[in-house]
């Protein structure tokens, strides 16, 4: 699915809402228990919900209380994602290439491993391509490398 939006934060917020709804209605996660796994060093926007799972204290400071329901793992480590998955995991939300503090490219096998893990555990995989998509890496989307 592709979500065309006016802003990256709006797209990420919609993806969060959609994945939570899917978890409650389809995966049968108990109400208000859905979790989304995110990677450290992320930048998905500056809304109140999005800064709740930011690892940048400058983005989070003085804006609490923060929105619950997010689990942070090490970027580029598929094994940390698999360890974090539980019955309440709705989705994994990651950037194929992180771009907030320079260009951080994960190991070549990272995204294929994450895809397999998500499929194995019935978890949605959300890729935020706002900074890396639409030909910026030489392919239409960065996940295609």
Enumerate the predicted regions with their spans.
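Conserved N-terminal phosphate-binding loop of PLP-dependent enzymes in the Aspartate aminotransferase
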Residues: 1-145
